[in-house]
Amino acid sequence: MRNSFITNFIKEEEGFRSEGYIDTLGHITWGYGFTNITKEEAEDLLRTRLQDIDTYMIQHYYWYRYLNEQRQAVIISMVYQLGMSGFLKFKKMIAALEEEDYTEAAIQGLDSVWAKQTPERAVRQMAMLKKG
């Protein structure tokens, strides 16, 4: 990973659990969003997954390269939580990001099922996306 800010941001957003638990959608979750795992293993998995997401975004979305670290952290967090296919459903938000209209991108991010399912996270992240 290029720096620890994004890693630390995802760690704060996901939280660490050494044993599996049932999340709000009924999914068994562990580690940093991964059932029994050491913290070191979870951190290795997290770093690898975040690097993969970052590399994919750099290779496939020109606008992502020009985002500051805070905005990249939000995008990586969304892809990490929702998967790439889930993130790509945010067509209007992505279009606003391409235009560097971060206010509109945040509005579109909040107008979603994701924001209804994880409202505190969505509000926090869309504020960060808007502010940069």
Q: Which positions does each model-derived feature cover?
A:
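Long, amphipathic alpha-helical surface segments
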Residues: 1-19, 25, 34-37, 41-58, ...
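Mid-chain, well-packed structural core segment of small domains
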Residues: 64-91
